[in-house]
Amino acid sequence: MSDVVLSAVPTPFAADGSLDLAGARRLFGFVAGVVDGLFVTGTTGEFPALDDDERLSLIETALSVAGPDRVIAHIGAPDAYRAARLAAAAVSLGATRIAAITPFYLAPSPTEVASYYLRIREAAPSAGLYAYIFPERTGVTVTPSQFCELADEVGLAGAKFSGAAALNVAACATARPSLRIFSGDDSDLAATLRAAGAGIISARSSAFPEVFAGLSAALRAAGAGKAPDASVTAAARQADVTAIAALGSSIGLVKEALRLRGFGPMGARMPVGFPDPATAARVGELVKSLAPAD
């Protein structure tokens, strides 16, 4: 796989909270046309507020517009029973890569975390399975040594480390170089790559895919020595990423930017931190300056 920038795409909802599947198809197609792939029905996709049929409909939509090799379908749940059923269903739809956040709400032991992933592996043996570690959202901390043990026992293909866990990307990627370790921190792609990470799974790239794809391309060209001005371009794109990151990391900010880019109301079911008027104005300024006019 050569994916470096995967977008953790939000789920479009109508103003009344109903799922906007047609809007999802349009959004997924747009983002997939710019970045390397999609991470669907994850945290940014408000997965706790989706029923199983809705999650599978969104996964099927992503697979149809981006292709199986460019989609990681998140099927994580609080319990192994539901996650395993979703995993099997996603694979039946054509998914070749699945991810699961650690079980949450009731605090699991490391043994229970491993059991959860083994149940998913048994339900979907042909799929590449990625652990999703996000302690701030789950209350589950997985140390680098625990992750390596988990990866070996379950046969993981990789992982996404978000929040405080993103600090463990270097340790885990170095200890298990055959795995694809992604960071959920999209503020410094170059640092992730220097730490031996595979790349980023980025919420903000859903709204500004051109910026993140441009940064990735410039870093690749600079590393290969193919373009004398690539380092200058990379620095400029990183400055754009820094400006985007300065707004904050809420899902509501991403949805506001997409709304301004013409992707419908981009409503939400969960409290996603929609911006206040002053912040919304700053989002609008960035959209005008960084997003190509359609």
Each model region followed by its residue ranges:
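Helix N-cap/beta->alpha junction signal
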Residues: 79, 185-186, 276
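Catalytic alpha/beta core domains of metabolic enzymes, predominantly
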Residues: 123-125, 134-246
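Alpha-helix C-cap/termination motif
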Residues: 34, 65-68, 93, 123, ...
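Short secondary-structure capping/turn micro-motifs that flank functional sites
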Residues: 47-48, 106-107, 167, 190, ...
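C-terminal alpha-helical cap/extension of soluble enzyme domains
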Residues: 5-11, 27-35, 194-197, 204-294
